[in-house]
Amino acid sequence: HQNIPAKAWWFGLAAGTMACALLEANNMRDITGDQVSGKKTLAARLGRDKAKWLYVLCIAMLCAGFVVGGQWITAVIAVAVYFPALKLAFSNKQGRELLPMLMISARAQLIVGLVTTITFFTTLR
């Protein structure tokens, strides 16, 4: 771990929390069904009100990873592409109505991943 640059750790945090945000979006969509069937997803255990804040925390952590890693513009892009999903998280929509949140989160992960890759390769020295 001593040979791995700090920037790589911060980008790893961002990538990991993007994946967690996608999982959380999926689990938020299924909260009611999971609670009825006895599934113990984190979102089902937390309930909708706390689960939406966990989703926000994932987005905040991925942005923090980029900012601390020196890629603040990627953090700004991430906020922009995740914003529609964040709005849905705080809406009254439930179940299948939250499917767009899952799709937006997946698309956002792809976009932010591409921006990260482009940024990485254009700043190599």
State the predicted function of each range.
Residues 1-21, 45-49, 54-125:
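Hydrophobic alpha-helical transmembrane segments
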Residues 20-43:
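Acidic (Asp/Glu-rich) catalytic motifs at the cytosolic membrane interface
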